[in-house]
Design a protein with these regions (language model features):
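Charged, compositionally biased N-terminal leader segments and the immediate start
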Residues: 1-54
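Alpha/beta enzyme core
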Residues: 44-52, 65-89, 99-251, 257-288, ...
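A short, histidine- and acid-enriched strand-loop-helix "catalytic/donor-clamping" loop
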Residues: 62
């Protein structure tokens, strides 16, 4: 089998491809990310940037204490982030644990949120430590319950041990289960990958295996979505597009808590992958607290006053 005509899926083919990738210039990546982080957006464009960021949020609750009531409240906010202003866009998705998918999907449909997808974390999130049978069942259960997006985690131990074929095969199998029913986001847990070179390699590995999105982190490990890491991933999707004519999305998650952070991410996207990626179809932000700050800043632009942070 050929994957984009670049590898055949074997361990030797994957190693040959990945080991030929150019190394990441650490100083250069960090300097460029820092430089782009100083870019400001004109006041006339700030409302657009804030609303674009809102539309890209994967509104998330992934806590052991999650309840059906909490998930329904999250869905209400996802559809109408500001109940007093119907012009505020809905978010990109609601992201929950497997057992909350049906509750989220049913409630979204009941409140006029059919357009908001439900994303489910899968494959023994957040550790990824389980048998393939468990990971497959985890994913199938989520899709059967109504998940339209699957956020799977890779086996970081296998990747760091150089077992690229094992990681690749797991992604391929989960992608097969998703089929045309669900988009697949592949979580790397970049805080455990040690080097930017590893981030670049795993980005290509996931894209070759069929990922629709590549995602930085579970949000459970720090550091998470640092600007240099996101930059490296955006460079990877840009270059992969040049190779294959296939656009892959990027989802930073973890540590993006305010509007300033979100706008920095949009600048990174625009200046690295390009403006085509400035859409929820190709860029998402995994967050829980971020939405409140985006709404506060949007109201400040409109009225000159801050609203309550407890939107």
């Amino acid at each position: 089998m050929s994957f984009y005509g670049l590898v055949d899926g074997s361990e030797s083919s994957l190693k040959n491809f990945l080991n030929k990738l150019p190394g990441v210039d650490q100083v250069g990546a960090e300097s460029r990310a820092a430089m782009l982080g100083t870019r400001s957006i004109k006041t006339t464009s700030k409302k657009w940037a804030i609303e674009t960021a809102i539309s890209m949020v994967d509104l998330t609750t992934l806590e052991g204490a999650d309840t059906p009531g909490k998930v329904r409240a999250l869905c209400n906010k996802a559809v109408r982030p500001d109940p007093t202003d119907p012009t505020v866009p809905s978010v990109g998705a609601v992201c929950v644990y497997n057992d909350m998918v049906q509750i989220a999907r049913t409630h979204l449909d009941e409140i006029g949120g059919k357009h908001v997808p439900v994303a489910a974390v899968s494959t023994a999130f957040p550790s990824g430590r389980a048998s393939m049978e468990v990971k497959i069942q985890d994913t199938q259960d989520a899709i059967d319950a109504g998940a339209q997006e699957i956020d799977m985690v890779i086996d970081r131990g296998a990747f760091l041990a150089g077992k690229y074929g094992l990681v690749f095969d797991e992604i391929v199998k989960i992608k097969e289960i998703c089929g045309d029913k669900a988009h697949l986001k592949v979580i790397f847990e970049t805080g455990e990958l040690v080097t930017y070179d590893n981030v670049r390699k795993v980005s290509y590995l996931a894209m070759l295996a069929g990922a629709d999105f590549i995602k930085t982190s579970t949000g459970k490990v720090a550091p998470a979505a640092t600007p240099p890491v996101v930059l490296v991933m955006l460079e990877a999707v840009r270059d992969f597009y040049a190779m294959t004519n296939q656009k892959i999305g990027v989802k930073p998650a973890g540590g993006i808590r305010n509007t300033k952070d979100a706008i920095k991410q949009l600048v990174l996207v625009n200046e690295t992958a390009g403006p085509d990626w400035l859409t929820p179809k190709l860029f998402r932000i995994g967050a829980s607290a971020l939405l409140n700050d985006l709404l506060m800043q949007r109201m400040k632009l409109a009225t000159g006053y801050y609203a309550s942070p407890n939107y």
